[in-house]
């Protein structure tokens, strides 16, 4: 219960920040959509970085590393740091200049003017919406998968149908998703892009600090950095995958399994000698078979998984970071900048911030393979490790709040951008900018944002069992 109280207090603090930022709102549509082009270097860095670090980055990367190993870092993070910075420098600054000069608020306005085509704008609208919707879904899904394990047992008599038996009494994903959606909707509804910028900055600072703290505590729980490297699941001389260690929650220490605990077996591999190797610490593909227990029926079943990253998959992921140049929420953040000089800090520091966030998440996922059951849902790996290795409920609550901060710092900008492009590129473009007053324009955007939030929540509940990483890639 203590953990839940800490999380609730964090959400209340975030709502308070939302109400505060709404008092800075200047009441104009330009301020609602692009903060009157007044965001400085630090706020720009925090809002842009916070927007890119979704549940995909934290919850998804940890879960994918648990499934495939540390090669997950190479799939996205290493190349993303360089590509993102390059796009911010080569494209972001130029688009900001065009927006400042010609009054663009959305990228559809830019493309319509550049190619002198109304039809192109109508074609881009559904494409951009479909580009953003999956990220909204993984935010809501990721939040639900994060909260349920760490609140297990808090309401055993109320929530009796958990995702997994050990999470009985935890806050169900549908309730977490609803609360997160309402909190984000509140401060975006009131403050627009200025409110989102301040909230993003606060939340980005929170999740970066809490991420480092969580990493340190997990390392301590595993007996130090050197010992943590020995924890991932190992392949023995018979081709059986074993866990050499277990974490005793009562003794609060890592204990050695004697004999090692078998959890699966190797089916196929490109390597001929796998004895004593840890597949989660290698990129070499290894086909394995695990067993898992159905949480509802208790039936034991087998499932196959490929550890490691095939070369063709590794190479193909190099192209994914290029998509950042077309994200409408990032375009909108670029236009909030006070000047071109405000981009300097973002271009330089963004790759470093990515490293600070992704390295711990990927390592924790690999380490988790040695202490968690292989059948655990990948999106729940991060919160399960926190719940297992961090004994203090207050600290667990703070660390979980950090994960929620990363999720919500993306949701707000994405909800806002959809309201912005609908209002400006569909409603105002067809009706004319003079038909509606500034207050009416803001109202139209707010109503559409409410509709998008409701639709996203409904879709997230329909797809709640999806893997957060694979939902995007």
Question: Where are each of the predicted segments found?
Answer:
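Loop-to-helix junctions at membrane interfaces in multi-pass transport proteins
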Residues: 36-39, 43, 60-79, 112, ...
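Helix-loop-helix module between adjacent transmembrane segments
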Residues: 75-188, 243-265, 286, 319-320, ...
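Hydrophobic, small-residue-rich membrane helices and short re-entrant helix-turn-helix hairpins
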Residues: 103-116, 191-204, 326-356, 381, ...
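Loop-to-transmembrane helix boundary motifs in multi-pass membrane proteins
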Residues: 113-122, 129, 165-176, 423-467
